[in-house]
Amino acid sequence: MIISYLQVFYLKIINISLKGFFYIALTVFTTVSSNLIANNDPSKPIKPPHYRGLCVLNDSCAWFSGSKGTVIRTTDGGKHFDTISPQSTNTRFAYFLPDGKQTVENYNPVSDAPISLWRKDYRDIWAKNEKEAVIMSAGDSALILKTMDGGKNWTIVYTDFRKDIFLDALEIDSKTGIGMVLGDPINTRKHFAALYTTDFGSSWNNLPIGDWNLPLDSLESFFAASGTSLVIIEIKVKAADSCVNCLARTKNLTVGFAGGGINPSYHIVKFKQQTRHTKKQNKRFNLSISQPRVVSNLIIPMPIAGGPGSGVYGMCLSDDGRMIAVGGNYTLPDSFNGASAHSTATNFGLKWSGGIGFQGHTGGYRSGVCISRPIFSEQLQSHPTPARVQTGIHKPNDTTINSLIKSGNRITFCTGTNGSDISSDNGVTWYSIPKQTLTSGLYFEGSFNACAYSSKHLWMVGNSGKFQRIPISDLLSMRIK
């Protein structure tokens, strides 16, 4: 399928064959030239997928995933899109033999049909490059799959068929391959589901159970609305002092995560894993890998409103160590009290401000949040700057984002099902962004599930196949209120 350059479009699944192949049609707001495949039964229209997983690699390449087993990739900044979803014909199972080596076998569409690859809701996705990516399903059993060839083939690297398993977030460090998956408490054990990887998601193991993943109250769990309830704070890999060039390593992983509960809290947990050489009788060395252990576990109260369905839905970490969290209650999308919080210094979330009664709230429920790199004067000078607005809850309607920015500021953007907001002061004050036509002619749709920045663009995905990619130059010119 060949389509012209587009920024906003709806991906609609039109038909699914017996083997689960996806046929895609695109309905776009901008000019499109494509061959649309008709629905065989117009009386039963097939709804487009909802996208919640988003991984942006650069200004050209991004992966996103969602319901109906859908995985999409662009490698040219949105000019064209590849539908690379796992199917019964391109998916294999990965197994580990007693000697620790991994082997695979083909997926059987008959015996393995209960897995229903094409029905999974892939709520989070991580990609290392244009070829290598990992996807995570949420709800109704758990699957983690990996591709090494840009989605042509997939390998199932983790399964859990317990009815009460629900995975929420996936994070992997692109340099070391160390990562983690976080899930809701499992009824049979009452602990958070937690997995780790050290090989870029090719294999996964359970993290040790302890106080660190025991829910603080009866409501504490996490939300898979954007895959951003988990962040990697720091990773350190140190070689053994006596063996600088060998494989013996000490690996330290520090993560932060937050969700819902009676009183939502932010967890900072540090894990340590050691890899040692053990001497054998023939004077050779064996590689012994220990299970990660918890070195420290901090629990920090958050000024986010709690209760059923309420809490932190998304977080982001800036390059200077500031944390920003958004949330609310998805059943009450217009309720803004306690829907956002920010860390008060570059301390990775050791102290938080905001929440109930704080004037710098978002416009309601928000599930995704992201923060840009610093914006410098040369970018600002290319846009006219109206009179600077006053901070606080009452804001004029005739100003642009550019009027808020000083050289060196970062632009924080958050979005949800009922709108989007922006901040120039690391989440202290938020401004609503109405739907509007941008200076480039693009139309800003307004509401999404997840967002992420590349160096020159803001990317967003949402319900009903919604996607948008906006140049930061357009972002600076957007009207706010």
Task: Label each PLM-derived region with a short phrase.
Residues 26, 36-37:
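Cleavable N-terminal signal peptides
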Residues 1-16:
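N-terminal secretory signal peptides that target proteins for export/translocation
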Residues 21-31:
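Bacterial N-terminal signal peptides
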Residues 5, 17-18, 25, 281:
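N-terminal leader/targeting signatures
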Residues 37-481:
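Residue-level hotspots at or immediately adjacent to binding/recognition sites across diverse folds
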